[in-house]
Amino acid sequence: MSDPITLNVGGKLYTTSLATLTSFPDSMLGAMFSGKMPTKRDSQGNCFIDRDGKVFRYILNFLRTSHLDLPEDFQEMGLLRREADFYQVQPLIEALQEKEVELSKAEKNAMLNITLKQRVQTVHFTVREAPQIYSLSSSSMEVFNANIFSTSCLFLKLLGSKLLYCSNGNLSSITSHLQDPNHLTLDWVANVEGLPEEEYTKQNLKRLWVVPANKQINSFQVFVEEVLKIALSDGFCIDSSHPHALDFMNNKIIRLIRYR
């Protein structure tokens, strides 16, 4: 049995065997480790490959088993496909193509469920009336919460690209607030009368905007209208059997379905 070989792939170390690396002779790795192509070394003497180290584990596992094993919530399919193209592992490229067809079929039929909650609370803040002179004030504030679930990860990504948080005076994508690929929770406030801009930052109050309309969402009615525009354009339709009509009209529950 040959000695173990340690690879440095983009800064991540992997240890394997020569037999594994040459299991597909026509691949770039097969050429590199059969002496047909030169290899580079890092300062520790490990074989260095200047590619993405994170997804290389899936490529290495495929070399070992000839099976494509990915977690259910895998989100780097595009990156893995590019890396497979680089290493020229043809059976892996074909397995990825089959996997993408499978995922595409699963994404066509989808369900979208949104539960909405709203409350009013009092916010206290200081107002600068003159240099060194401040007064304490308060105002009612509408606080909104939307709990969004969809069986389509791609739709949630699309929705996340259209909605932006306004915080610290800047607009930022809400995609970082995805709890997992199928869940998204949003919390935001409407404009508060008399509240200075710096107080939104100080009290960590986020406002919500939608693009490309560049419209601030100050009510559930506007939120529902904008989400429906995005969902309907992506092939969803309202599920007339659920929820109860009163819940839908009162903006408490929204359920949409998509059949393709």
UniProtKB/Swiss-Prot annotation:
Give the pathway: Protein modification; protein ubiquitination
Q: Which PROSITE patterns match?
A: BTB
- The BTB domain is annotated at 3-72
The superkingdom of the source organism is Eukaryota
Show the InterPro entries listed in the entry.
BTB/POZ_dom, KCTD11/21_C, SKP1/BTB/POZ_sf, T1-type_BTB
Which CDD domains does the record match to this protein? BTB_POZ_KCTD21
Pfam families recorded: BTB_2 (PF02214), KCTD11_21_C (PF19329)
Q: Could you list the residue ranges forming a coiled coil in this record?
A: 88-112
The entry's note on the tissues where this protein occurs is: Highly expressed in cerebellum and brain. Expressed in adult cerebellum (at protein level).
Disulphide bond pairs: none
Biological process annotations from GO: protein homooligomerization; protein ubiquitination
SMART domains, alphabetized: BTB (SM00225)
The alphabetical list of record keywords is:
Coiled coil, Growth regulation, Tumor suppressor, Ubl conjugation pathway
Biological role stated in the UniProt entry: Probable substrate-specific adapter of a BCR (BTB-CUL3-RBX1) E3 ubiquitin-protein ligase complex mediating the ubiquitination and subsequent proteasomal degradation of target proteins. Promotes the ubiquitination of HDAC1. Can function as antagonist of the Hedgehog pathway by affecting the nuclear transfer of transcription factor GLI1; the function probably occurs via HDAC1 down-regulation, keeping GLI1 acetylated and inactive. Inhibits cell growth and tumorigenicity of medulloblastoma (MDB).
Q: How does it assemble?
A: Homopentamer. Interacts with KCTD11; KCTD21 and KCTD11 may associate in pentameric assemblies. Interacts (via BTB domain) with CUL3; indicative for a participation in a BCR (BTB-CUL3-RBX1) E3 ubiquitin-protein ligase complex.
Tell me what this protein is called: BTB/POZ domain-containing protein KCTD21
Its source organism is Mus musculus (Mouse)
